[in-house]
Regions:
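Gram-negative bacterial Sec-dependent N-terminal signal peptides
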Residues: 1-19
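Early extracytoplasmic/lumenal segment of secretory-pathway proteins
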Residues: 21-86
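Extracytoplasmic ligand-binding site segments that recognize negatively charged/polar headgroups
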Residues: 29-34, 79-84, 88-218
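Paired acidic/hydrophobic, glycine-rich loop segments that form the ligand-binding mouth/hinge
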Residues: 71-78, 212-213, 229-234, 250
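A ligand-binding cleft/hinge motif common to bilobed small-molecule-binding domains
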Residues: 84-86, 230-248
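Periplasmic-binding protein-like
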Residues: 196-205, 243-269
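Mature extracytoplasmic/periplasmic domains
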Residues: 261, 266-332
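Conserved C-terminal helix/tail region of periplasmic/extracytoplasmic solute-binding proteins
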Residues: 327-358
Length: 358
């Protein structure tokens, strides 16, 4: 029933795109806008094909429902790395011909130009993004502002409500890092009953003060409305609010969890060949730089990071220091393990939901 409802919603919501040559599904908000400005519009202009962007809270869910129902209306989807691996294993996605991806602008072969892990059997990275936390600078004196992952969980030192994404992924890892587990040891720790108990025990320390969010747009809105003192968020959402809208928000990079976002093609996409062409265009050196000019997610190609990228919103902000991949932002960071979440997503989310209900 759940899959049927998801599919029905998807078909109703996205039916208006039926006449488009390529339909791209993404996450909406600042991220969807960045992909629209950096990829969808330029590709359409360059090729003469029609293209449209549609939104979903998590594109992996509706595209899986569409494929299983045999009624696919989306050609390209933007999904999290673990979902790209899982859906590929389940036969939901078309394979990607990695050899067909264009060389970098400097002539470097794609296989050598992409960062390790950025190209998988069924997906190509469009950016590297991060789960971070942020606070409103007007709420804290400079000498009392939160600075570490541990501060997020320290209600005595930094009082106030906390915003957290409602799910196990990125929350359990963040809790362990805040509790002193080194990034290199997080997944080994989380793979043990004792480590899992430790993560939930850390979450227990702030549970009564948490405001849960699900859609990415909710996190910066919680800050703007004063509902929380600080919140976890997608770094691009905070950048868009702070730099694009002038909100007094500050990111704390300590304890960030970063990962690749992937473009994939659902099995049975109505315009498969055009979808593949779109992905080649979007993940070229120029395509990746074009997206990064609109949102603070790092390009996953070496050639796309050679020259400074300037924020299109104001024509002056240099994006480098605002990216998850900036060296100064990666001091205490963790690359999200897709293998871990492919293997443990269901069981850990079941326990997470049970914990929420307690």
């Amino acid at each position: 029933m759940k899959k049927t409802l998801i599919l029905t919603t998807a078909l109703v919501s996205f039916g208006f795109a039926a006449n488009a040559d390529v339909t791209v599904m993404s996450w909406g908000g600042a991220y969807g806008a960045a992909q629209t400005e950096g990829h969808v519009k330029p590709w359409a202009a360059a090729t003469g094909n029609a293209a449209v962007m549609v939104d979903a809270d998590n594109p992996a869910q509706p595209i899986k429902a569409m494929v299983e129902a045999g009624n696919v209306t989306v050609d390209v989807a933007s999904v999290e790395y673990a979902d790209a691996i899982r859906l590929c294993d389940e036969g939901i996605l078309e394979p990607i011909d990695a050899a067909s991806l264009p060389a970098g602008a400097d002539g470097t072969a794609a296989a050598d130009d992409f960062f390790p892990g950025a190209v998988t059997e069924c997906g190509v990275s469009t950016d590297i993004w991060a789960n971070v936390y942020a606070y409103d600078t007007t709420k804290f004196p400079a000498d009392a502002a939160p600075k570490t992952a541990a501060d997020f969980f320290d209600l005595a030192k930094v009082p106030g409500k906390r915003g957290l994404r409602k799910g196990a992924k990125a929350v359990l890892e963040f809790a362990l890092m805040a509790d002193g587990v080194a990034p290199a040891d997080v997944y080994a720790t989380l793979s043990t009953p004792e480590g899992l108990d430790r993560a939930f025990a850390k979450l227990d320390t702030i549970k009564k003060d948490v405001v849960w969010w699900e859609a990415g747009a909710q996190a910066p809105q919680l800050l703007a409305d004063g509902e929380v003192a600080m919140t976890t968020a997608y770094n691009g959402r905070i950048f868009a609010a702070a730099i694009g809208e002038g909100k007094p928000f500050q990111i704390v990079w300590d304890g960030q969890l970063y990962e690749n976002e992937m473009y994939v093609v659902p099995k049975g996409a109505p315009n498969k060949d055009l979808a593949m062409d779109f992905i080649k265009y979007a993940t070229s050196t120029e395509g990746l730089r074009a997206q990064a000019a609109h949102i603070s997610y790092g390009p996953p190609r070496k050639s796309a990071n050679v020259e400074p990228i300037i924020y299109a919103g104001d024509g002056k902000t240099v994006m480098g220091p605002n990216l998850p991949t900036a060296p100064e932002n990666m001091t205490n960071s963790l690359l999200t393990s897709s293998d871990f979440w492919v293997d443990h997503d269901s069981e850990l989310n079941e326990r997470f939901q049970a914990w929420l209900a307690q």
